[in-house]
Amino acid sequence: FSQKHHLALEMGTEKAQVYTSFFYEKNQGIALQDERQDYGGRVNASFKLFDDWLEVRPAVDYRQAARNNHYPNFQQAMRNNPTRSPYDPDSETGYNVWINESLDYNVVADAMLEDYYGLDKWFKPEVNLKLNIKPIPGLNYQQVVGYENRQWELHQYWPSTHRSEIDNSRKGHAHLAFSKTENLTSEGYFSYVKDFKGGHNLNATAGYSYFEVNGENFG
């Protein structure tokens, strides 16, 4: 099952335009504890300043995805005895946890008693600057600066009542993981275009490009 919502807004004048879009999306799988929620937005703009000497085009993009994925074993569910209830109203969890049987276990209890939460985040701002050197037709300078940040978080928890904890005589355990990647880009160049009589033209470009990547993680 899924639902999607989108909203877009646009406004502007001859010298300034702004476009924004936002979205929300939720997907829920057939299996228990299998769903995902996404939301995000993007803003683009364009401005002409100082009698068109300077053009500024910023853009910002953000997205977030929250995941709950348990990857239930459908094959195991098909092998289970259909007369054996996965629920037990007398247990503290409400589930019938079958133990010490590696080939016959309650996939419903396994999924419902484990906590899984994964979170993806993307953030990407960028700005493009163009300087038109009007006294010299055809000459301009462009500068692009961009940044990208991506993060991933994972939270998992198995309580003492989970089958894996009972089988291994544990009182529950948790797992936390995190990773972050950052990219930085900077490019700048002069461009000159001149047309001559007879169909000839001159096109010259000179500039630089810089890229940097950093990251960290654990778990």
Q: At which residue positions do the language-model features occur?
A:
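Extended, hydrophobic alpha-helical segments in both membrane/secreted and soluble proteins
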Residues: 41-43, 143, 186
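Glycine-centered small-residue hotspots that permit tight backbone geometry or close packing
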Residues: 148, 166-167
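Short, acidic/charged, Gly/Pro-enriched secondary-structure junctions
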Residues: 46, 126-130, 187-191
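Charge-patterned, long linear interaction tracts outside catalytic cores
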Residues: 116-147
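Flexible loop and strand-edge segments within Gram-negative outer membrane beta-barrel domains
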Residues: 2-23, 27-34, 40-122, 154, ...
